[in-house]
Amino acid sequence: MAFLASGPYLTHQQKVLRLYKRALRHLESWCVQRDKYRYFACLMRARFEEHKNEKDMAKATQLLKEAEEEFWYRQHPQPYIFPDSPGGTSYERYDCYKVPEWCLDDWHPSEKAMYPDYFAKREQWKKLRRESWEREVKQLQEETPPGGPLTEALPPARKEGDLPPLWWYIVTRPRERPM
């Protein structure tokens, strides 16, 4: 089980949140009628909220252990897994058919002429990437602590007024929005 591998490195709060989410997902598999599911989800939420402000960490850890054992005995034998999730029927199914972007550079000009708008826009993006790459790398280095990231949180996607980085979908999270 993948979620147990990172267990020692998670905070107590993260463990509780992940247990709660797993329990809700398995409850969804047990209760197919939405109203019945909602009723039992509210009961489960009340059980979690009952011990939300527990100050004694020994007791909180014991409660978490008991809750994980209860989850183990009550989990659904065949839980619903979303098709594109790991373990789902379509997980990474079409990744083998995705062609890397650099392959488009090798297209013959007659092939590129069939899609003039796309390739004109693509050339603009390539030019923008060449012009802004150094600035984007500098921004990423400025926002990352010297010893590397200390948490899983990544730097924001961009600063106010900057163009969106071209690598945002790989290494960043969305920029914070004030509440």
From Swiss-Prot:
Protein name in the entry: NADH dehydrogenase [ubiquinone] 1 beta subcomplex subunit 9
Organism: Homo sapiens
Family: Belongs to the complex I LYR family.
Disease: Mitochondrial complex I deficiency, nuclear type 24: A form of mitochondrial complex I deficiency, the most common biochemical signature of mitochondrial disorders, a group of highly heterogeneous conditions characterized by defective oxidative phosphorylation, which collectively affects 1 in 5-10000 live births. Clinical disorders have variable severity, ranging from lethal neonatal disease to adult-onset neurodegenerative disorders.
Residue(s) carrying Phosphoserine: S85
Region Disordered, annotated ranges: 136-162
Function text: Accessory subunit of the mitochondrial membrane respiratory chain NADH dehydrogenase (Complex I), that is believed to be not involved in catalysis. Complex I functions in the transfer of electrons from NADH to the respiratory chain. The immediate electron acceptor for the enzyme is believed to be ubiquinone.
Protein's cellular compartments: Mitochondrion inner membrane
Membrane topology category: Peripheral membrane protein
GO CC terms: mitochondrial inner membrane; mitochondrion; respiratory chain complex I
GO biological process: aerobic respiration; mitochondrial electron transport, NADH to ubiquinone; proton motive force-driven mitochondrial ATP synthesis; sensory perception of sound
Location of N-acetylalanine modifications: A2
Pfam entry (one): Complex1_LYR
UniProt entry keywords in alphabetical sequence: Acetylation, Disease variant, Electron transport, Membrane, Mitochondrion, Mitochondrion inner membrane, Phosphoprotein, Primary mitochondrial disease, Respiratory chain, Transport
InterPro entries listed in its UniProt record: Complex1_LYR_dom, Complex1_LYR_NDUFB9_LYRM3, NDUFB9
Chief place of localization: mitochondrion
Assembly with partners or alone: Mammalian complex I is composed of 45 different subunits.
Domain of life (superkingdom): Eukaryota
